Amino acid sequence: MQVPRIAVTVDLVILTVRDQQLCALVWRREAEPYAGRLALAGGFIRLDEDLSSAAARVLAQRAGLEGAPVHLEQLRTYGYPDRDPRQRVVSVAYLGIAPDLPVPSAAQMSWYPFTSLTAAAMAFDHARILKEGVERARAKLEYTPLGAAFCPDEFTVAELRRVYEIVWGTSLDPRNFHRKVTGAERFLVPTGASTARDGGRPAKLFRRGPADLLHPPMLRPRGPQD
């Protein structure tokens, strides 16, 4: 029996909050197929590397984010037979979360608002991968401290609330949010310092605590705004 030849890639859904918008890192393809369309940072897996090593290499070399504080986790695998017209390609997608970062060093890579990255604008099945990555991030904000990965090392509760509002796409009551995040066990650790960078009264600065899961969870509002 002849073993079919299948290529394997890693593709990265890298998200950040820039200019009060949820943004993803993409680049514009110059060659066919899908010339002129936007695509996620990705690359073929080498014979001498495992999946996590390939993802780290693509993050550093293709995405231009070497050394950046990016939370990276495996999202899922995509293997539809016709997802790449050139050959059979299986993609292992990763989700990356980062605080606001400058324009990456890699040529052609740019931050685009998530709402502008429609299926018609993107190559292959990357719009689907991106959408599922965003939904993973939205869901994990409910029960893990992942929201802090969008923030700098030290942040205020108001800055963290804005992350939740932007990622979830909804408004949150400031007092209720403050009560919930400060009441969640080991979610936030006070630094003992404060800042007035929000333009109002000095606000306390926090760091992410050691919690892996939020107890109680931060439930996303349901309704017309979802």
Where are these regions (language model features)?
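N-terminal strand-loop-strand
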Residues: 1-38
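Active-site segment of metal-dependent pyrophosphate-handling enzymes
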Residues: 6-10, 23, 52-105, 138-147, ...
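Short, well-ordered beta-strand micro-motif
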Residues: 14-16, 26, 95-97, 205-207
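Active-site-proximal cofactor/substrate-binding loop regions of enzyme domains
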Residues: 30-33, 37-51, 55, 60
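NUDIX/MutT-family hydrolases
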Residues: 93-96, 103-142, 152-158, 162-163, ...
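Short helix-coil junctions and helix-kink-helix linkers
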Residues: 162-171
